[in-house]
Amino acid sequence: MKYRLIVALAMLVLSLPSQAERIKDIANVQGVRSNQLIGYGLVVGLPGTGEKTNYTEQTFTTMLKNFGINLPDNFRPKIKNVAVVAVHADMPAFIKPGQQLDVTVSSLGEAKSLRGGTLLQTFLKGVDGNVYAIAQGSLVVSGFSAEGLDGSKVIQNTPTVGRIPNGAIVERSVATPFSSGDYLTFNLRRADFSTAQRMADAINDLLGPDMARPLDATSVQVSAPRDVSQRVSFLATLENLDVIPAEESAKVIVNSRTGTIVVGQHVKLLPAAVTHGGLTVTIAEATQVSQPNALANGETVVTANTTIGVNESDRRMFMFSPGTTLDELVRAVNLVGAAPSDVLAILEALKVAGALHGELIII
């Protein structure tokens, strides 16, 4: 029943006609993007839920040296309230120095929980190695863990990952090509030649001929003013322009782990017959030992006794006529009571046989 509901909902969604969407909802401006930042730091103040790994001690010792505290070479600090963590954040486009970012903090070692901890000053670097933000602050951890003396343990959610809202201050901005050049380029989130052409046509209808041209299935190039203030208002007008996206190509998407199957609107089948059923073969091996009388001159003989059982379940066959559509396909699959795993095997066989007109995608 659950499987039928999933397929029915997918059928309803994918069979809806294409509606006009704003350019800002289906495309991004090239060069206007976020950047990922990452850092390595220490969380302190943990209530005995930290770690004692070698790299934690080394990082802790290095931090003390930076504050002018030198420990003996053979001294190993006993720390239970410290954890080594990875800190990462997304830096949106156009963000300026002084603005703040949310950061996520994740334990790298054996720490049992980060609840109650405080992240010390951590440099967040970009892919180019430059520092773009500095993070510090108290963690918000939704999970928790508790452990008894007998080894019993209770864990809820993930206590080794936390967040710091507005926990990083931006120190350097990232340059974008938005304000340079004679063109702006829109990149479709889903590549499609028809949608790219329709977007260019809609922009040309608004601005005039030859103002926009599709470069490929993803990109549409638009002539833009050089003045930055004019470019902002120009883009604000374009991103709210309505475009009717092209209909999706025929696809069948199957999640082999969860059994979810989504069938696109234009999936059709050529004439085919499918048999649904199962064949169970049971092979049992039993060993028999023949032990002769102690006074006889015989030898002990070991023989194998093999029993093979075959159990064939009821087979059901259904046929598809030419041009069978989504509705008939789903109805026929439900009629034979096929489970999602069975449907996956049926779809793969139909694709190999050339009877399935559509792209079969297994994720």
Curated annotation (Swiss-Prot):
Query: Which GO terms fall under biological process for this protein?
Result: bacterial-type flagellum-dependent cell motility
Principal location: periplasm
GO CC, sorted alphabetically, is:
bacterial-type flagellum basal body, distal rod, P ring; outer membrane-bounded periplasmic space
- Give its localization: Periplasm; Bacterial flagellum basal body
> So which domain of life are we looking at?
Bacteria
Q: Which InterPro entries has this protein been placed in?
A: Flag_FlgI (IPR001782)
Pfam families from the xrefs?
FlgI
The terms under GO molecular function for this entry are: structural molecule activity
Residues of the signal peptide:
1-20
Which keywords fit this entry according to its UniProt record? Bacterial flagellum, Periplasm, Signal
> Oligomeric state and partners?
The basal body constitutes a major portion of the flagellar organelle and consists of four rings (L,P,S, and M) mounted on a central rod.
Q: Which family does it belong to?
A: Belongs to the FlgI family.
Q: What does this protein do?
A: Assembles around the rod to form the L-ring and probably protects the motor/basal body from shearing forces during rotation.
Query: Cross-referenced HAMAP family, in alphabetical order?
Result: FlgI
Indicate what this protein is called per its UniProt record. Answer: Flagellar P-ring protein
Q: Per the UniProt entry, what species is this protein from, by scientific name?
A: Shewanella sp. (strain ANA-3)
As recorded in Swiss-Prot or TrEMBL, the protein's gene is named flgI
